[in-house]
């Protein structure tokens, strides 16, 4: 993945080269986008250049051309947005946001994934509507969503985005025979928990045995340290007609908005969490404070896929939440810590609810001012995309220093 680093100027400067002019023009365009989102007047284009460049200092190119024809398989383009999983996505398009297909079987969702201020893109996002129709769900479709936040490179997060949903599908399609003791709901819950844990275990085994080059570690001639230092968090959500199943390892997070209240469906795995610290120390490791609590002073999350050199202190095993859907469920937000480091769960839910309300016009064009310069005639985004976009931009405005990936699933207007 190409690395991009920009030195942001806070003054006019004397360089009037074409490159600098283009950079300033992009910043002016970004400032006008921000004005459209945060309600500032369009006259902001007449502000002093110094103030404008400071305000848009994150300078993220939000109108990257989408280069992926499917969701799942590769990380989002640097600073760009994932392309929609539709046949028309093969055509040239520069739409910065998109919406999930609005069929009777699929939930409505919006995705945004940007590099932000980080020097490289290590996040990956996967969306697989209608993943399969397993027996455990009475032959009805299940929908898969996931956010992966890589570290030590994007190798493991990319591998997760291409493989995890396949493992989940394979586990679901197996004949899940077991003694059906207890109520029907208890049996279904045990089966789902087993499916997710086995899928995560298989994913970790693949990640720790696969080199950066894609070859099995014992068979390649690469430096073994390259594969050993790469890892990824993983938060996955499987949506069915009756339930939401979330599995999480690491510090990416899933939050359900129910009747206006934020309900965490995952718990961040941080080394200073008492139970995680005890587990790490029992495995022979240490939690050192180096710019925050870290496993052996290195990794800021206590669980992850991969990270072979920190096993067994860094565990792969996910915590699984099995929750029945209710009529008050409004939306589900999955995001990497680039969002959660600067936004609380309740604030994220409040923003998503505002965007998903019926009275909120889905035709609100976040890029109206930018389209004055490069009009592409694209359709307006859905409310789910509006929510994901606004959350991302708010995180950028709050100086988030990491990649930011956000998935917003509309549970109120999706078919059940």
Curated annotation (Swiss-Prot):
Entry-linked Pfam families: PP2C
Keywords per UniProt: Hydrolase, Magnesium, Manganese, Metal-binding, Protein phosphatase
EC number of this enzyme: 3.1.3.16
Binding site for Mn(2+) 1: 149-150
Effect of deleting the gene: Hypersensitivity to ABA, salt and sucrose during seed germination.
Domain of life: Eukaryota
Disordered: annotated span: 1-20, 32-51
Cofactor dependency: Mg(2+); Mn(2+)
Induction behaviour: By ABA.
Residues the entry annotates as binding Mn(2+) 2: 149, 337, 402
Free-text comment on the cofactor: Binds 2 magnesium or manganese ions per subunit.
A GO biological-process term: response to abscisic acid
SUPFAM superfamilies linked to this entry: PP2C-like (SSF81606)
Catalyzed reactions per annotation: O-phospho-L-seryl-[protein] + H2O = L-seryl-[protein] + phosphate; O-phospho-L-threonyl-[protein] + H2O = L-threonyl-[protein] + phosphate
A molecular function (GO) term: protein serine/threonine phosphatase activity
Domain PPM-type phosphatase: residue ranges: 108-411
Main function: Negative regulator of abscisic acid (ABA) responses during seed germination.
Similarity comment: family membership: Belongs to the PP2C family.
Protein's name according to its UniProt entry: Probable protein phosphatase 2C 75
């Amino acid at each position: 993945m190409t690395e991009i680093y920009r030195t942001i100027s806070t003054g006019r400067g004397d360089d009037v080269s074409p490159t600098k002019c283009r950079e300033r023009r992009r910043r002016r365009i970004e400032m006008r986008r921000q004005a459209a989102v945060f309600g500032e007047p369009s006259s902001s284009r007449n502000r002093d250049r110094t103030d404008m460049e400071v305000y848009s200092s994150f300078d993220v190119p939000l109108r990257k051309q989408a280069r992926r024809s499917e969701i799942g398989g590769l990380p989002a383009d640097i600073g760009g947005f994932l392309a929609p999983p539709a046949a028309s996505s093969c055509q040239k398009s520069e739409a910065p946001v998109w919406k999930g297909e609005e069929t009777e079987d699929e939930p409505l969702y919006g995705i945004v994934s940007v590099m932000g201020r980080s020097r490289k893109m290590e996040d990956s996002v996967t969306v697989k509507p209608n993943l399969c129709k397993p027996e455990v769900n009475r032959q009805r479709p299940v929908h898969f969503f996931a956010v992966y936040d890589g570290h030590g490179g994007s190798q493991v997060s990319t591998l997760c985005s291409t493989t995890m949903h396949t493992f989940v599908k394979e586990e679901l399609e197996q004949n899940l025979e077991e003694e059906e003791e207890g109520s029907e709901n208890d049996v279904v819950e045990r089966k789902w928990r087993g499916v997710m844990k086995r899928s995560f275990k298989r994913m970790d085994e693949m990640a720790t045995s696969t080199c950066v080059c894609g070859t099995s570690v014992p068979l390649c001639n690469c430096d073994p340290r390259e594969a050993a230092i790469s890892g990824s968090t993983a938060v996955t959500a499987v949506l069915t007609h009756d339930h939401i199943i979330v599995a999480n390892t690491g510090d990416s997070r899933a939050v359900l908005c129910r009747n206006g209240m934020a309900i965490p469906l995952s718990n961040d795995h941080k080394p200073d969490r008492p139970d995680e610290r005890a587990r790490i120390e029992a495995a022979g490791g240490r939690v050192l404070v180096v710019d925050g609590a870290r496993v052996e002073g290195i990794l800021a999350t206590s669980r992850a896929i991969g990270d072979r050199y920190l096993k067994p202190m860094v565990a792969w095993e996910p915590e699984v939440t099995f929750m029945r859907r209710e009529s008050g469920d409004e939306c589900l937000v999955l995001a990497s810590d680039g969002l959660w480091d600067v936004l609380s769960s309740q604030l994220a839910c409040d923003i998503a609810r505002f965007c998903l309300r019926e009275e909120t016009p889905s035709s609100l064009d976040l890029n109206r001012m930018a389209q004055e310069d490069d009009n592409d005639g694209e359709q307006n985004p859905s409310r789910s995309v509006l929510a994901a976009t606004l959350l991302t931009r708010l995180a950028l405005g709050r100086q988030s220093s990491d990649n930011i990936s956000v998935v917003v699933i509309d549970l109120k207007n999706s078919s059940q």
